[in-house]
Amino acid sequence: MVEPRDTVIREEDLNPDFLEELSELVEPVFEEEEVLSVQACYQCGTCTGSCPSGRRTSYRTRLIMRKLQLGLVDEVIKSDELWMCTTCYTCYERCPRGVKIVDAVKAARNLAAKKGYMAKAHRMVAMFVIKTGHAVPINDEIREVRKNIGLDEVPPTTHRYEEALEEVQKLVKINEFDKLIGYDWEEGDLVD
């Protein structure tokens, strides 16, 4: 069941400069025009109507875009819905205004992560990358399938080459990705 939302928008919650600030913050990854394209959204709902994730979750693309336009920073970066986008780009392909919706969502996710708001599932995937070098680590079932189709049970990746995994972990530490997701090296787990 969808929970009722607080629909009152207070003037003090608005940040009309949020898109500008967001575009400056994420410039090394996203072009300013990608984030600022959100301003062109006229709330037709095509994005929400075509979103495969929105059919199965509470994710409403149009609502995220509107909150970005209004500068409702906390509502955007603290929402679980922000992490429900699968980045399939269906919304972008169908948007009549060419709004770079997925890029704006990813930029907002970057900001959310920097401020300590990241979905547990995303943190878990990141932990798997740190521990194994893979978002989806190999398991016994996959080993068996590989063997049955004539492949080596262990693929020639970080699963086979310990030095490659060490390189991945070295990059994680250099970029402080471990701190971003709250990974404890001694415990080998996430810190909540």
From Swiss-Prot:
| Taxonomic superkingdom | Archaea
Q: Which GO terms describe its cellular component?
A: plasma membrane
Start and end residues of each 4Fe-4S ferredoxin-type domain? 32-61, 75-105
User: What is the protein name for this chain?
Assistant: CoB--CoM heterodisulfide reductase iron-sulfur subunit C
Q: What is its EC number?
A: 1.8.98.-
A Gene Ontology biological process annotation? methanogenesis
The protein's GO terms of the molecular function aspect are: 4 iron, 4 sulfur cluster binding; CoB--CoM heterodisulfide reductase activity; metal ion binding
The UniProt record gives the binding positions of [4Fe-4S] cluster 1 as 41, 44, 47, 95
What cofactors are annotated for this protein?
[4Fe-4S] cluster
Give the family, as the similarity comment puts it: Belongs to the HdrC family.
Cofactor note as given: Binds 2 [4Fe-4S] clusters per subunit.
The record's note on quaternary structure and interaction partners says: The heterodisulfide reductase is composed of three subunits; HdrA, HdrB and HdrC.
Annotated [4Fe-4S] cluster 2 binding lies at: 51, 85, 88, 91
Task: Print the keywords alphabetically.
Answer: 4Fe-4S, Iron, Iron-sulfur, Metal-binding, Methanogenesis, Oxidoreductase, Repeat
What top-tier enzyme class does this entry carry?
Answer: oxidoreductase
Q: In which pathway does it act?
A: Cofactor metabolism; coenzyme M-coenzyme B heterodisulfide reduction; coenzyme B and coenzyme M from coenzyme M-coenzyme B heterodisulfide: step 1/1
Q: What does this protein do?
A: Part of a complex that catalyzes the reversible reduction of CoM-S-S-CoB to the thiol-coenzymes H-S-CoM (coenzyme M) and H-S-CoB (coenzyme B).
Q: Does the keyword Iron-sulfur apply?
A: yes
Its source organism is Methanopyrus kandleri (strain AV19 / DSM 6324 / JCM 9639 / NBRC 100938)
